[in-house]
């Protein structure tokens, strides 16, 4: 009908928020920064008009509801140990593709920028939504089609398509932290079969490692790896041993020695190996 699918928003950003002095004091008492409650412009930024009937999907596994309208998100991979409620804007993965379902049309946008980026889908102001990034280029691919599956087709044309996985990977897989020994794994496997609950794979979390050192195995708690894996394989389970790639700082640990000798690890701006604390301690 000649109506444009997308319109750039040209009036600038304005936060629909009035905060009294009393509210500022409450926010500050709870640890919030009130120094800049206005709109923060990013070095890379683009704004679009937001229509009342627009619904948003995509972005990968983010918190909140399936429809992302009226929420804000960040593309900045983060390991959040707390409950994943809607207050958290980033999780483990960053997939910068957004799909919009309008009343009679659909469209999508792929933001090809690897820097820390932000999407505010009407939370700041119901009149617009915006994409911003700390740096990089504004490389935006517009995806069009008659239905949402058409957008997926166009998006994967750009990124490449994943081959069909093995059939067992599409079944239920059991995964949790806290299996302290091989007997815990055996107990879980037996209960699944005794209760006739379909399950195709059991994930071994970082408990199986020796002191959380990647590419090691704790023989004292888990026995020989081949024995346990063969045992649950007879019950119809595949085994997935997870990797948490924080390499423990330990001069006697082969991974640490090899990484330092070959310069495999991330460094800071001074060229010093970057160290932070994760599961094995300093890593």
For each of these PLM feature ranges, what is it?
Residues 1-166, 176-177, 182, 189-194:
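Catalytic and substrate-binding clefts that recognize carbohydrates or anionic sugar/phosphate headgroups
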Residues 60, 163-283:
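Aromatic-lined carbohydrate-binding/catalytic grooves of carbohydrate-active enzymes
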């Amino acid at each position: 009908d000649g109506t444009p699918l997308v319109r750039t928003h040209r009036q600038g950003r304005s936060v629909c928020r009035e905060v009294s002095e009393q509210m500022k004091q409450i926010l500050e008492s709870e640890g919030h920064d009130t120094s800049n409650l206005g709109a923060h412009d990013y070095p890379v930024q683009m704004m679009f008009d937001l229509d009342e009937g627009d619904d948003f999907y995509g972005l990968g596994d983010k918190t909140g509801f399936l429809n992302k309208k009226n929420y804000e998100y960040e593309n900045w991979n983060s390991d959040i140990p707390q409950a994943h409620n809607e207050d958290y804007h980033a999780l483990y993965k960053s997939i910068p593709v957004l799909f919009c379902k309008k009343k009679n049309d659909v469209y999508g946008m792929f933001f090809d920028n690897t820097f820390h980026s932000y999407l505010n889908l009407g939370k700041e102001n119901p009149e617009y939504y915006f994409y911003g990034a700390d740096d990089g280029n504004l490389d935006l691919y517009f995806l069009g089609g008659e239905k949402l599956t058409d957008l997926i087709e166009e998006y994967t044309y750009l990124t490449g398509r994943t081959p069909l996985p093995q059939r067992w990977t599409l079944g239920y897989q059991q995964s949790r932290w806290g299996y302290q020994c091989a007997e815990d794994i055996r107990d879980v496997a037996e209960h699944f079969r005794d209760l006739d609950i379909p399950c195709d794979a059991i994930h071994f979390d970082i408990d199986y490692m020796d002191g959380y050192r990647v590419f090691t195995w704790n023989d004292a708690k888990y026995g020989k790896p081949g024995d346990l894996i063969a045992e649950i394989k007879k019950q119809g389970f595949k085994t997935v041993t997870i990797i948490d790639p924080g390499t423990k700082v330990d001069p006697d640990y082969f991974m640490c020695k090899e990484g330092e000798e070959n310069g495999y690890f991330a460094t800071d701006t001074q060229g010093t190996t970057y160290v932070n604390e994760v599961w094995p301690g300093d890593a």
